[in-house]
C-alpha cells in the first residue's frame, strides 16, 4: 500500500496559510525531498527538481526581490510548473505579486508559514518521510513494556492476545493487536501502529472483542511505538533445545532492520506476561551495558581456571 500525499494534507496538518493557487491543492506530492530554489533564482533551471515541494526562505526571497520586475516574472513562471506540488514561503514573508500571478496561472499552490526556514524544512521532511516510509504488516501484538516496544508473534491460538491483556492489567500499554502495521522511518527504526479499524481493540477467544481504552483508561494504550524486541511464542516442543543461558541472540529481519528475537515456549503453568516483562527489562539492561549471561559465563570460566569447581 503506497501512501498518497497531497498539498491539501500539508494545509490540514501544519500551520500554513494558502495565499494563491487554490486550484492545485489536490496536487500529489511524490517525494519527501524538499528543494530550496537558490540557484534557480539566478536563472539556471537545467537541473531544477520541479517534482519536489519548493521552499523559499529569507535568502532566496532577498535575491528574488533584487531582480527586475521582468526577471522576477520569468523566474516565477519557470518555478511554477505543471507538476510542482507547491511552494512554501517561510518566516511569514510577503509574497511578491509576480509569484502570485504565476501561481494562479499555473495552479501551483503558494503556502505561507510563520516559522523559521529550518524548522519548516525539518517538520515537513519528517512528515513526508513518515508517509513515504517502506510499509509492511505482521500478524502479532505490539505492546509498550517499560518503554520498550515488544512485538509478540506466534501461530494463531498460542495466546498472544491473552498475554497482551495480562500485560495491560500489569500497567503496560497496548499499541496493536492481531495486525501490526510497520513503517521503516529510518535505516534502523521500525514504527508500529494499529490499523484505524481495530485501534485500541483486543480479541479474546471466549469473550470476543474488548475495547482496552474503555476498560482500562487512556493510559493503557498508545497510538504508535518504535519496535525494539521480538518475542516469538510457540508451543513447547520436547525435542527442541531451548536457550537456557541467553548467550546467543537470535535476530529477526523486518524489511531492512534486524531486531533481537527471543523464543518463549508455551505450556501450562508458565506466566507468559511476567516472562515477557522480564525480557523487556533485560533488554533495557543490555542496552545500558549489563549482560547477565556474559557475566555468568565469565564468572564460571574464572572459577574453572582457579579450580574452585569439582
From Swiss-Prot:
Keyword NAD: no
Domain of life: Bacteria
Catalytic activity: [HPr protein]-L-serine + ATP = [HPr protein]-O-phospho-L-serine + ADP + H(+); [HPr protein]-O-phospho-L-serine + phosphate + H(+) = [HPr protein]-L-serine + diphosphate
Leader peptide range in chain numbering: none
Entry's Gene Ontology molecular function annotations: ATP binding; magnesium ion binding; phosphorelay sensor kinase activity; protein serine/threonine kinase activity; protein serine/threonine/tyrosine kinase activity
Binding site for Mg(2+): 161, 203
Region (Important for the catalytic mechanism of both phosphorylation and dephosphorylation): 202-211
Further remarks about this protein from its record: Both phosphorylation and phosphorolysis are carried out by the same active site and suggest a common mechanism for both reactions.
Domains (record comment): The Walker A ATP-binding motif also binds Pi and PPi.
Protein name: HPr kinase/phosphorylase 1
Amino acid at each position: 500500500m503506497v501512501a498518497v500525499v497531497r498539498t491539501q494534507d500539508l494545509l490540514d496538518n501544519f500551520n500554513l496559510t494558502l495565499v494563491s493557487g487554490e486550484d492545485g491543492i489536490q496536487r500529489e506530492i511524490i517525494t519527501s525531498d524538499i528543494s530550496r530554489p537558490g540557484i534557480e533564482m539566478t536563472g539556471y533551471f537545467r537541473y531544477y527538481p520541479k517534482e519536489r515541494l519548493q521552499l523559499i526562505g529569507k535568502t532566496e526571497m532577498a535575491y528574488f526581490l533584487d531582480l527586475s520586475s521582468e526577471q522576477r516574472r520569468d523566474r516565477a513562471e519557470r518555478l511554477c510548473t505543471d507538476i510542482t506540488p507547491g511552494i512554501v514561503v517561510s518566516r511569514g514573508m510577503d509574497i511578491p505579486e509576480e509569484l502570485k500571478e504565476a501561481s494562479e496561472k499555473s495552479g501551483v499552490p503558494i503556502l505561507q508559514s510563520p516559522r523559521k526556514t529550518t524548522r519548516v524544512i525539518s517538520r515537513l521532511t519528517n512528515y513526508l518521510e513518515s508517509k513515504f516510509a517502506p510499509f509492511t504488516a505482521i500478524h502479532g501484538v505490539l505492546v509498550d513494556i517499560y518503554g520498550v516496544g515488544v512485538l509478540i508473534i506466534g501461530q494463531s491460538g498460542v495466546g498472544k492476545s491473552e498475554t497482551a491483556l495480562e500485560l495491560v492489567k500489569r500497567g503496560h500499554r497496548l499499541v496493536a493487536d492481531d495486525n501490526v502495521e510497520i513503517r521503516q522511518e529510518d535505516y534502523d527504526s521500525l514504527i508500529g501502529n494499529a490499523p484505524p479499524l481495530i485501534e485500541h481493540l483486543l480479541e479474546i477467544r471466549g469473550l470476543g472483542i474488548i475495547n482496552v481504552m474503555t476498560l482500562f483508561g487512556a493510559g493503557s494504550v498508545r497510538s504508535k511505538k518504535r519496535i525494539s524486541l521480538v518475542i516469538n511464542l510457540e508451543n513447547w516442543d520436547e525435542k527442541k533445545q531451548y536457550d537456557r543461558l541467553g548467550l546467543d541472540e537470535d535476530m529477526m529481519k523486518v524489511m531492512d532492520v534486524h531486531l533481537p528475537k527471543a523464543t518463549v515456549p508455551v505450556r501450562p503453568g508458565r506466566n507468559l506476561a511476567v516472562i515477557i516483562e522480564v525480557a523487556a527489562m533485560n533488554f533495557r539492561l543490555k542496552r545500558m551495558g549489563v549482560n547477565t549471561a556474559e557475566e555468568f559465563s565469565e564468572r564460571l570460566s574464572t572459577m574453572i581456571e582457579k579450580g574452585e569447581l569439582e
